[in-house]
Amino acid sequence: MQRTQIVDALAATAPQPVIRLCGWVRTRRDAKGFSFLEINDGSCLANIQAIVDEGIPAYANIGAVSTGAAVDITGELVESPGKGQKWEVRVQTLTLLGAADAETYPLQKKRHSDEFLRSIAHLRARTNKYGAAFRIRSEAAFAIHEFYRERGFFYVHTPILTGSDCEGAGEMFRVTTLPVEGSPTPASGNRYENDFFGKECNLTVSGQLEAETLALGLGKVYTFGPTFRAENSNTPRHAAEFWMIEPEVAFADLEEDMNLAEDMTRTVVRRILDRCAADLDLFNRFVDTTLVERLRQIADEPFARCSYTEAIELLLKSGKKFEYPVSFGLDLQTEHERYLAEEHFGKPVIVYNYPKEIKAFYMRLNDDGRTVAAMDVLVPRIGELIGGSQREERLDVLEARINEMGQNLEDYWWYLDLRRFGSVPHAGFGMGFERLLMLLTGITNIRDVIPFPRTPGNLEF
């Protein structure tokens, strides 16, 4: 008999004489002559109650059906007299698929700390909180693909292994097939001729540069994949491996870039509100009681916008004491970003036209010679959600910027070729997917919105 998911069983419009369900037992309560099982299969937040009568043969082994055990049941789907549940199952057959030792099973019927659950990341998807987080993660990923497909973008795949440093920061993971004792070092002159590729190879920090090449042939593209940063930052906002959404659009300027970033954010938020109501309600009750209200505001209201210069003036006039200094030419820190989004504007804000010294070489130099056509989307409780820019399309200006940043022109010969052959204005941005999920769930630690977090000193699973 075909299995029915619990989410579909609970949505039934009429009783069913026989139904088959599989899942994991959340709780078992024994009464005289029968037992109540709460079963969840991960398809939704809600459990379904199964009533096992002592008259069925499998009842003799009901003691082995403990919390965490996997079961396969068939029975009659009937209206439930219990409060808060529409349907329940009167079990006819029960098969224990996999037992779970009640003494050693880590997930008991109590609220576990996030720190503890990170140590058993292979099991935490069975909890209410993390099951909800990962369902929202799945729905958000689908909504992103849906958003770009509806707008005529092509989904492209950019390399994980790269010989380029998009950010110019050098905080990259090196990939080598050489033994440790044979690895290139400064003392050996960084000779890579014996390595697999014959040159230095790293894990990508961004697919942007490669996506630009595809946009300048396909028009509108986006990437959605893992990126890697070897930053030794043990903060709630940083991870060594995370996912990025990076659109690139030919013939677009900074204004179009900002419009796309806002449209994408608001559309995804709107779809999560529509499609994940039960899971969002869990986070709204137990993680952040203002979550749904804030998400509705993001979905309904246009974002604020201000230049970097205006942002600095607002921070200086705020009267607040910040830990980090505020001055033109200094990058905005998280505390500054959150003040602007949470306290001054009270909603997301797009800050644009940053000083060229604090932004990457590929961002278009503005006519003032001091700023670049860059933008960041700042949101409450998170800070920076998106960073983007109009890209520098002028060959001479780009070469000068690469030299200013101390980068090697030869490493970017192919990127410069785009400016030699039919160069056009173009723009794009990067959104950290995990930061979007923190916004959508109210979860404050990036380790809790990715199934297997990779952070300094942590490579379990």
Curated annotation (Swiss-Prot):
Checking Gene3D superfamilies in the record gives: Bira Bifunctional Protein, Domain 2 (3.30.930.10), Nucleic acid-binding proteins (2.40.50.140)
* Pfam families associated with the record: tRNA-synt_2 (PF00152), tRNA_anti-codon (PF01336)
Give GO cellular component annotations, separated by semicolons: cytoplasm
The GO molecular function terms of this record are:
asparagine-tRNA ligase activity; ATP binding; nucleic acid binding
Q: Which UniProt keywords apply?
A: Aminoacyl-tRNA synthetase, ATP-binding, Cytoplasm, Ligase, Nucleotide-binding, Protein biosynthesis
What are the recorded Gene Ontology BP terms?
Answer: asparaginyl-tRNA aminoacylation
Write out the annotated subcellular location: Cytoplasm
Q: Which SUPFAM superfamilies match?
A: Class II aaRS and biotin synthetases, Nucleic acid-binding proteins
Q: Which family does it belong to?
A: Belongs to the class-II aminoacyl-tRNA synthetase family.
Q: How does it assemble?
A: Homodimer.
This protein is called Asparagine--tRNA ligase
Native source species: Nitratidesulfovibrio vulgaris (strain DP4) (Desulfovibrio vulgaris)
Species classification: Bacteria, Pseudomonadati, Thermodesulfobacteriota, Desulfovibrionia, Desulfovibrionales
Name of the gene:
asnS
